[in-house]
């Protein structure tokens, strides 16, 4: 009988320390992955637009001139 109050106190202390549910972890991973993916896509766009500008500008100048 003396163990029951101690067991209840341990349960109350352990409940806030419980890990997040799987869905919440998956959502936080998606949120963290979003900006990284956006930076990679932006870097690819910058590289592609730089290559396109370096190729298209001389081509257009050659056609016009």
Swiss-Prot record:
Q: Keyword Secreted on this protein?
A: yes
- Which cysteines does the record link by disulfide bonds? none
Select a single GO molecular function from the record's annotations and give it: toxin activity
Q: What subcellular locations does the record give? A: Secreted
Which positions make up the signal peptide? Answer: 1-19
Tissue expr: Expressed by the venom duct.
What more the UniProt record tells us is: The mature peptide does not contain cysteine residue.
In the record, the note on similarity to other proteins reads: Belongs to the conotoxin T superfamily.
Q: What is this protein called?
A: Conotoxin VnMLCL-031
């Amino acid at each position: 009988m003396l163990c029951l109050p101690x067991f209840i106190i341990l349960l109350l202390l352990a409940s806030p320390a419980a890990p997040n549910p799987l869905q919440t972890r998956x959502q936080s991973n998606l949120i963290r992955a979003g900006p990284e993916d956006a930076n990679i896509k932006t870097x690819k766009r910058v590289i592609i637009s730089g290559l396109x500008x370096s190729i298209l500008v001389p081509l257009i100048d050659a056609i016009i001139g």
